[in-house]
UniProtKB/Swiss-Prot annotation:
InterPro entries: NA-bd_OB-fold (IPR012340), Ribosomal_eS28 (IPR000289), Ribosomal_eS28_CS (IPR028626). It holds the Pfam family Ribosomal_S28e. This is Small ribosomal subunit protein eS28B. GO terms for cellular component: cytosol; cytosolic small ribosomal subunit. The lineage of its organism: Eukaryota, Fungi, Dikarya, Ascomycota, Saccharomycotina. The gene is RPS28B.
Amino acid sequence: MDSKTPVTLAKVIKVLGRTGSRGGVTQVRVEFLEDTSRTIVRNVKGPVRENDILVLMESEREARRLR
């Protein structure tokens, strides 16, 4: 990770479910730490739980909802 790359910190407020062909991805709703009124849905690979802090390299992309 380059030190000049802008990153955004986001807090996991709700775990929505597992997705991916083998369930290896978790869909979560995150709240930005700088702007707490803004929330988006993201896909996260690896272990994650509520109140975890994520470092988002790209903060505009939102995941499609689970069916």
